[in-house]
Amino acid sequence: MRTIAVYRPGKRFPSVSVTGAGCALLCEHCKGRFLRGMVPAVSPPALLSFAARLEREGGTGLLLSGGCDAQGRVPIGPFLPAIREIKATTRLLVNVHPGLVSPQEGRLLADSGADRIAFDLVLDPVAIATQLHLARSPQDYIDSLDALCRAAPG
């Protein structure tokens, strides 16, 4: 029988926002509320410092996310070297929630050493426009998922 690992946000596996409480979209389901409950780490040094403290205090990992830009992307790029360092210097699991990605961004995420990618696959064009406030299409979500799958090791 296959085992499914579940990581609930909490003290040992907190959610961390690379944008603090900032978000360009303010989607209908969140309007920034979820971001306010996340640990802010708006610079790579802040993320590294938080990760070191989390491990010292018995943490098991973190969800790295944040608010989206106007294109539906979480600005993870500047944090990729920090993710690599966290993976090299701690035992923490890193789950990244990047939003929409290009093929190049998918490869860079895979190269960062992140353990997991959390991806929202939204295929309803009305929901994308009215709930997420994005001028994107279902195909953009499919292309992003494809980019992540192609970049995934193994």
Listing of model-derived features with the role each one plays in the protein:
Residues 1-39:
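N-terminal [4Fe-4S]-dependent radical SAM core
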Residues 4-7, 16, 49, 58, ...:
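Structured catalytic core of nucleotide-sugar glycosyltransferases
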Residues 14-16, 25-28, 45, 49-52, ...:
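N-terminal, well-ordered alpha-helical segments
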Residues 32-47, 54-78, 86-149, 154:
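Core AdoMet radical
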